[in-house]
Amino acid sequence: MNMSQSQKIVLQPRSIVVPGELLAEGEFQIPWSPYILKINSKYYSTVVGLFDVKDTQFEVIPLEGSFYYPKINDIVIGLVEDVEIYGWVVDIKAPYKAYLPASNLLGRSINVGEDLRRYLDVGDYVIARIENFDRSIDPVLSVKGKDLGRVSNGIVIDIMPVKVPRVIGKNKSMYETLTSKSGCSIFVANNGRIWATCPSRFSEEILIEAIRKIENESHIKGLTDRIKQFIEEKLGERNASSGETKTNS
């Protein structure tokens, strides 16, 4: 860790921090984060979280919180809340509503009086990219790109946005466990929504239970193995139950 004498990181890596706790002193070149407050040359945590350090960089990974903070090029799953003349107002689980211009979805200018509900209506989900955002304007969405657009099948599962890294796992280990064991195809968006298509209602139920377990136990080591065992046990119970039914019949 190559720091100057004027720089000091107060806490050990992987420490649990609380709001107002001092993290570091001095001048550090770190990206802006809603979870770190700088006052003069001191850095404080704004949330309950995990303090992570890499060389002279540090961050706070929140362990709780329901809001998503948009970043340009993030992929999100939005819920259409309103249809306006020139586009759609979309909830992306952020403190700000997002906007999807109709011209972006249609690839052309809209016609006067055109009913945009034909393409996206209130209650529809849409997979989109954050095209533009800063703290002076609301997020603008784009659906130009592969696999972007209206969600037309499957289910959407909401989780806390701060749990997204845990659902994906290191080197996608948790993601691969969920998909291979449940048989479901899933897409985890940056804003804490998961789109899933499953081969059966039973697989759907197992997937939802497993994801809730990840949310509730995200602080526990060895969680990927626990989830693998959990799904295998659920499948085993179902297979055992099916076997008993066939025997009795």
From Swiss-Prot:
Cross-referenced PROSITE patterns: S1
GO cellular component terms attached to this protein's record: cytoplasm; exosome (RNase complex)
Places the protein is found: Cytoplasm
Name listed for the protein in its UniProt record: Exosome complex component Rrp4
Keyword RNA-binding: yes
Biological processes per GO annotation: CUT catabolic process; exonucleolytic trimming to generate mature 3'-end of 5.8S rRNA from tricistronic rRNA transcript (SSU-rRNA, 5.8S rRNA, LSU-rRNA); poly(A)-dependent snoRNA 3'-end processing; RNA catabolic process; U4 snRNA 3'-end processing
Organism per entry: Saccharolobus solfataricus (strain ATCC 35092 / DSM 1617 / JCM 11322 / P2)
Complex and partners: Component of the archaeal exosome complex. Forms a trimer of Rrp4 and/or Csl4 subunits. The trimer associates with a hexameric ring-like arrangement composed of 3 Rrp41-Rrp42 heterodimers.
SUPFAM superfamilies cross-referenced by the UniProt entry: Eukaryotic type KH-domain (KH-domain type I), Nucleic acid-binding proteins, Ribosomal L27 protein-like
Molecular functions per Gene Ontology: poly(A) binding; RNA binding
Endpoints of the signal sequence: none
Pfam family, one: KH_6
InterPro entries per UniProt: Exosome_RNA_bind1/RRP40/RRP4, KH_dom_type_1, KH_dom_type_1_sf, NA-bd_OB-fold, Rrp4, RRP4_N, RRP4_S1, S1_domain
